[in-house]
Amino acid sequence: MTINITPISNESFNLNETSSTTINLLNHFDDPLTTGKVANFNLEDNSLGSGEINIVLFDQTGEGAPIAVNNFASYVDGGSYNNSIIDRSFSTSQSKYILGGAYTVENLEVKRITPNAPIEDEFSSQRSNKAGTIAMYKLTDEANSARNRWVFNVGDNPDFDTRGGGLTVFGQVLSPEDLNTLNAIASLPVTNTSLPVINPVTSSQFSTLFSRLPVNDNTIANDFNFPYPSYPFTEDNQFVRFENITIDNVLEFTFTVESNTDPDVVSASFDNQGNLILDYGSSLKTPLYRFQNQDLPGTYLFVGEQERQSILSNFRNFKEEGLAFKTASQANGDTIKTGETDITIKATNLLGESAQQSFKVSVTGDVPENENQDQLIRFNRFQNRDIPGTYLYAAEEESRNIRQNYTNFIEEGIAFYTYGADANLGQDIYRFQNTSQPGTYLFVGEEEKNSILANYPQFVLEGVAFEVAV
């Protein structure tokens, strides 16, 4: 895959005219396959692999398959795939796939998913049926005949590239963990059986032969000899069933600063809309990004750019929620200076492919004096040893109390410098404690504070923690 690039121009700024500038990086990097749509297949049995399958949907016009994605989304939005099952698992040395999208099971009642009109094929050899992809399935070799059925290519299936003009690949697994889940399903035992199936349109019932139906129970697998057993199931979870399938819109790239030759001239950060923020006129220009620990929902970590890159690469349980606020990295505030710096931005798409761009920034003007540098105070980071992966940020006075009285909090060092709660020099950041996870904290601005107070009673407001730039 090629990431399309539109060059970022060199920039020049005057300190006496502006203190920061925003550049929309989505105008300079484009993934030709996706706009950032991700489908989540949520398995009822979360012991199968990771319990879910995440798929990047190829909805971009041009190189993607927007007709197939829109067709798939119409079934998702209508709830048609809720409680849907994998109805066939096939594996040989030449082919390996699992098939779904045709039937639902609820209270042991099997129903046919009502198909919409067939869609136009969008097969491309650049989107072939390789391991980890999903395609619209056709029951025959007739072109333009795909409807509601889809197939996960667990292995490479070159035959699907020629069936009826080719099965249209419209997505790919987000990560190796998702492919592992596909393999876990494909490794389950299978059975051949006849099941009564209800047509919801006519309410009629008809017997249907299921060949190589994967089962979550070894006791009902069989050796494929006739006569096939009739309805050996006693529980819904003996089927491989998806509780639901949803589609989210996410940012199609993760952006990082690969290099910045003089961050004292310009600090580079990113918001969660794909904007690059260049700061050059503030003594609080060190960005802190917020991550939520998905293993402990409602617990958070705030980190700078270097630690952010390490988390993005190595700790998938921490989900980035975007730029939180800006502080200073040194006691007398971040340096404001004129000069030039060369910045390189790396864009990594949802499938892990990346591209880089470099550009130059020049800053001129008269450097203002930092009259408030003596108002900056130090905040330290503590990790709660009783709940690993959860953190507290405290000023020095509170830090002394924590060191003396709360040995479960392990000090990890200086987190940042910023203004105290009563300085009236920045924007207030409020501290909440999560009573569902006592000893865990969240730091938010005014707007999010009001939302939490209105909607999340488990978070208790403890007051203004500090003031920052945002």
Residue ranges and their predicted role:
Residues M1-S9, S362-E369:
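Short S/T/G/P-enriched beta-strand
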Residues D45-S47, T261, D295, L351:
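Solvent-exposed strand-loop boundary residues in beta-sheet-rich modules
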Residues L251-F270:
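Short, solvent-exposed loop/linker segments at beta-strand-coil boundaries, enriched for Pro/Gly
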Residues A347-N349:
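Conserved structural position at the C-terminal beta-strand
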